[in-house]
């Protein structure tokens, strides 16, 4: 059950979202669905260049220029989970950016994580 709570004339009611199958395009990556039914896709914009990030290769170059390095987990219980992700860390902070290995699963949550940790370099936009 998902939706939006609407307050009108002193009454609060839940207006439910249509099921995912009602939206054209269905499910997936790229940050927001299939482009129809009112769902807006999101993209990560690198503000200094005005370039939209379209691959992990370009994202990794941009993050490296900001001091981020690939982080390779060193075994233990988290190794299996880390093998499913790309991770970046910055030596000057305790921050860690974790992204799914498959770029098609790169969504708005991951984009906003990058934006919060690099406020002057990235922005999430509607496409």
Swiss-Prot record:
<feature type="compositionally biased region" description="Gly residues">
    <location>
        <begin position="24"/>
        <end position="38"/>
    </location>
</feature>
<protein>
    <recommendedName>
        <fullName>Flowering-promoting factor 1-like protein 2</fullName>
    </recommendedName>
</protein>
<dbReference type="GO" id="GO:0009909">
    <property type="term" value="P:regulation of flower development"/>
</dbReference>
<comment type="similarity">
    <text>Belongs to the FPF1 family.</text>
</comment>
<dbReference type="InterPro" id="IPR039274">
    <property type="entry name" value="FPF1"/>
</dbReference>
<feature type="region of interest" description="Disordered">
    <location>
        <begin position="18"/>
        <end position="40"/>
    </location>
</feature>
